[in-house]
């Protein structure tokens, strides 16, 4: 596990929502893990899950007492990005504002570099 100053941000809105979800689950050990997988209409897609573990090589980013976890493979695609949360007409969701993405799909769930 490394806790370094990486150019990846974890917004206050995302941290607040994670904190609320962790409280609902009544498990303070949970952390939000963001990861990249192959797929989606643009080649890569973002995934979000709750995880109790921090693996060797993972990077952690903290905000408001909650932790975002990123594996080293995914981190290379997320450098300079912002993990955020929004609620709107399209529903509520976590998303990544990713400056590395050269194209994104209409919903923002997948991208290419």
From Swiss-Prot:
Lineage in the entry?
Bacteria, Pseudomonadati, Pseudomonadota, Gammaproteobacteria, Vibrionales
Set out the biological process GO terms recorded for this chain's protein. Answer: iron-sulfur cluster assembly
* A Pfam entry, by short name: Fe-S_biosyn
> What is the source species?
Vibrio parahaemolyticus serotype O3:K6 (strain RIMD 2210633)
Q: What is this protein called?
A: Iron-sulfur cluster insertion protein ErpA
What does the Swiss-Prot or TrEMBL cofactor note state? Binds 1 iron-sulfur cluster per subunit.
Q: Which family does it belong to?
A: Belongs to the HesB/IscA family.
Kindly give the SUPFAM superfamilies that the UniProt entry links to this protein: HesB-like domain (SSF89360)
Keyword tags: Iron, Iron-sulfur, Metal-binding
Q: Read off the Gene3D superfamilies from this record.
A: HesB-like domain
Q: Name one GO molecular function term.
A: 4 iron, 4 sulfur cluster binding
Q: What is said about its interaction partners and assembly?
A: Homodimer.
The task this protein performs is described as:
Required for insertion of 4Fe-4S clusters for at least IspG.
Names of the cofactor(s): iron-sulfur cluster
């Amino acid at each position: 596990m490394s806790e370094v100053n990486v150019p990846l941000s974890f917004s206050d809105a995302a941290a607040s929502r994670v904190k609320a979800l962790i409280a609902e689950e009544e498990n303070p050990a949970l952390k939000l893990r963001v990861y990249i997988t192959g797929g989606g209409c643009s080649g890569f897609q973002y995934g979000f899950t709750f995880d109790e573990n921090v693996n060797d090589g993972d990077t952690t980013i903290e905000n408001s007492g909650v932790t975002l976890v990123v594996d080293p493979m995914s981190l290379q695609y997320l450098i300079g990005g912002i993990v955020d949360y929004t609620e709107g007409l399209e529903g509520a969701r976590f998303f990544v504002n990713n400056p590395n993405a050269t194209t994104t799909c209409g919903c923002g769930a997948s991208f290419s570099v």
